[in-house]
A protein has these predicted regions:
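Membrane-embedded alpha-helical bundles of polytopic integral membrane proteins
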Residues: 1-217
Length: 220
């Protein structure tokens, strides 16, 4: 609980400051930093420590190139040399991963199939998911639209926590997560939908643009 409160007091305002008020390149830098940290966390979870130290830098570098590629594909960079160059640089970095796999074959810290999958997951799949925030930020009224996944996630998580604490009696999946309850799950679902309805109202007051209420509820 203390950790959640600390994140809410310190982390959330800092996150909102970067996403909503800083230039869109700051969002790119934030996502790059998250991908670098996430690369290490993922590899550390599935690989031995020696292989994690050996390969996480490669995964982190690939993730940075993927994020940069998405950023420079934006309309402000249309027709610029960097927009044409980034896909080739990203592809070259991906090729480097497979070259390393071949060169290190048979050695103690070789890149086996598990390591390759972890590197590609950390270097490609996760960055592609996180760059959805970047794509939202680069749209018109992106400073507001980028909050959609955050509002849905935070409201759902918060209501699931407090709903479970107040009303939770029936275990949801005790073998997977002993503290989760069905009442908490329902509270989270309701909280996410309610949060998105409130977001729709505030977004209209700020931009005079009406988001489709059905989509807002579905996203919640």
């Amino acid at each position: 609980m203390k950790q959640r409160i600390l994140v809410a007091v310190v982390g959330v305002p800092a996150l909102l400051g970067v996403l909503c008020f800083a230039p869109d390149w700051a969002t790119m830098a934030l996502i790059m930093a998250l991908c670098i940290i996430g690369s290490h966390e993922l590899l550390a979870a599935v690989l031995p420590p020696e292989k994690t130290r050996r390969w996480w830098g490669l995964a982190a570098a690939l993730s940075v190139f993927v994020v940069a590629d998405v950023y420079f594909r934006g309309e402000p960079f249309a027709g610029t040399p960097i927009q044409g160059l980034m896909p080739w640089l990203t592809a070259a970095q991906a090729v480097v991963v497979f070259i390393c796999m071949v060169l290190e074959y048979g050695k103690k810290e070789e890149m086996d199939f598990t390591a390759l999958c972890a590197i590609l997951m950390a270097g490609v799949a996760i960055p592609m998911a996180l760059t959805c925030l970047l794509r939202l930020r680069m749209l018109e009224h992106g400073a507001g639209l980028v909050l959609i996944p955050l509002v849905a996630a935070f409201m759902s998580d918060t209501m699931a926590l407090f709903g479970g604490m107040l009303f939770g009696k029936t275990k949801l999946a005790p073998l997977v997560s002993p503290k989760k309850t069905r009442e908490g799950a329902v509270s989270g679902l309701v909280g996410g939908m309610a949060g998105m309805i409130l977001f729709r109202i505030f977004f209209f007051l700020c931009t005079e643009i009406q988001l489709h209420i059905g989509w807002c509820v579905l996203l919640g």
